[in-house]
């Protein structure tokens, strides 16, 4: 088993609604809520078939009394989407079973090692839902001084400037970010209601559906205030015929 690194799963939140008889305490689980309302940080690993079989045995898959193996999308720091297995127990009741101190420490130490927030863990331990995935990174026409910036003024507050890893291309009168080795300049915003904001931004960016123009991903943003994970929109079409913006800066490209 090889660790790839920190990653996020969108739409799911951490909970302790499963009682583990072997641990004699609660065990971590995931529950589906909605994009913009929940997300869960963790670690992404590359595994082989032998390891997968061992994990299935450990988690009790496919016995419905225990955890079920499910394919989800995990996003790494560069915004790349990975199809990954995770294990979810589909509890029929909204129970809360506190974990042991050792089990909690195991999760917390893992998050700290990967420099990931423990807010969602703390909420799960308190059986509450106060944590928010509240940041979005923009790098084109939604930035200050650009034609669609007004869309960010309703419900979003500028936090600071930032950069993400990737390559930037000129699509038309707007740019597109793709996974790459370059650095792309942009702005980080905090949303007052991310669920509502992404409904609007998804429509603007043509995200979702069977033939999207952009895909909304989760990506790590580098700022003067530190590293922040945020939603960002990646161009979903081929870039072979497009001009690459070497500077990674849409504002300076348009001066």
Which sequence ranges carry the predicted segments?
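A glycine-rich, hydrophobic/aromatic-adjacent loop/helix-cap motif
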Residues: 1-255
